[in-house]
């Protein structure tokens, strides 16, 4: 029997998730949608031909008797409110990042979920579902390269919009690395420093770009992440793990290698959605299957909280240039 989903937010990512849950994935049916722009929500329902009911707001959708699970894809500052409402209603909820816009908000969600007595929350960090990252983690976990000593990473975007600010390099961009590298190493961060190289002439006047984020983990692994959101040439994600006895690199996306006019070339993707489209499918299928089986295994509210704590420290490090401690409480047994 199909899991009946309600989707809050019909912007770009909400529409993508409605489409994949209705047309691509198995075992789900979108029966309810809402958006701050109700006309847009109605248009999405009509254009996709899904026959879902449009609700006045997120709380009405969560309370609807036929909604069995909720997808929160709305504006970031609204996430905490809707996730807490879903937990209070006892309904599983998939929340796009951020889980909340503050670490304190994430902690409220963690506390509410623990009080509920069962896992209800999955956070929309899709990189742990990417085939390349999974292969890289398999190599690390197997011990083939020994203990990881250093990671060299990069997160590059061709360009960003006028509303993009320097701190968004952490809260919107690096946040994915903060999640996936912690998962990759099965280790928590203990400190961070951010430095700014020479500013790119392609960067917006009001922001600093690129920047280098240097993290240390509890087991002593050192990580450097280059964040360069105006690189021009493409969307490029890199991750190299230097171990005691070998090096492992994140594989490039599968592309045709072209030999032509005395040149050997490979295309580079320009859109992040193309780079991780398969991972989005896998993560939502995992949520659907987990809810139906009674156990959610995807990125947890605690993972969302850990990323938020690290992000807060990174933003502080942006501003003061110092090595900033990252202090995370002990993981509750609930999330073991």
UniProtKB/Swiss-Prot annotation:
Reactions this protein catalyses: myo-inositol + NAD(+) = scyllo-inosose + NADH + H(+)
Record protein name field: Inositol 2-dehydrogenase
Function (record text): Involved in the oxidation of myo-inositol (MI) to 2-keto-myo-inositol (2KMI or 2-inosose).
Known EC number: 1.1.1.18
Keyword annotations of the record: NAD, Oxidoreductase
A Pfam match: GFO_IDH_MocA
Keyword Oxidoreductase: yes
Superkingdom of the organism of origin: Bacteria
The keyword Ribonucleoprotein appears for this protein: no
Organism: Pseudomonas syringae pv. tomato (strain ATCC BAA-871 / DC3000)
